């Protein structure tokens, strides 16, 4: 396997079949390795996991502070690298997360906005882009043209489920099953029929906007919300914004 591949294991570690063998396999490579799990489902890593993975720990609200302390302390005790990811669905969640970060002096953290189907106003206020956001983002000529061809968020990523089904994006149907198809067949099908790797801003209303290729590649939020333009730009008058 190429060393520039990133391996990510997601889910409840206790339910991953033959986990020790999987770790032994991954340990043969110098590639980046991540474990992505919930702080509630977190299992104290076995000795084979020590210092091999970067742990990305998702935290949802309401937070069980006692369990969070147990999880973070177990990682610290084994000198594992970890980052806390707060799943934020409201301004109240954000403020509570900051209280925890400051009280427990958390150094490595991220805020991950979560769309619930009922918090579109929160997204419009805090996630949707303004014209100033778009224009203040630095970009090379190379990146400008890359965005016209591929999706920077999804390109090259595959998700292998426990039953062998392979998704280029878990929001779309499986492309193939790894037990019956080769990696070559998977890549060929995604390039020819898939919706993820080549998903760019060529749909309405983005295809009529002067900022079309300055914006980030479409993300999972566009799929979940069912809207292609998560911004406040008025395409008919780019100097005005839809607030």
Where are these regions (language model features)?
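Long, charge-rich, low-complexity alpha-helical segments
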Residues: 1-12, 16-29, 33, 208
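A broad structural signal for short, well-ordered beta-strand segments within beta-sheet-rich domains
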Residues: 2-6, 31-32, 54, 79-83, ...
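Structural motif
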Residues: 8-17, 35-43, 56-66, 84-92, ...
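Acidic (Asp/Glu)-rich catalytic clusters
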Residues: 25-29, 44-54, 68-79, 101-104
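A short acidic (Asp/Glu
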Residues: 46, 70, 95-97, 169-171, ...
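Non-catalytic interaction/Regulatory regions outside core domains
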Residues: 67, 74-83, 88-122, 227-243
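A C-terminal junction/extension of Radical SAM enzymes
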Residues: 100-172, 214
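Flexible mid-to-C-terminal extensions adjoining Fe-S/redox cofactors in radical SAM and related proteins
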Residues: 175-243
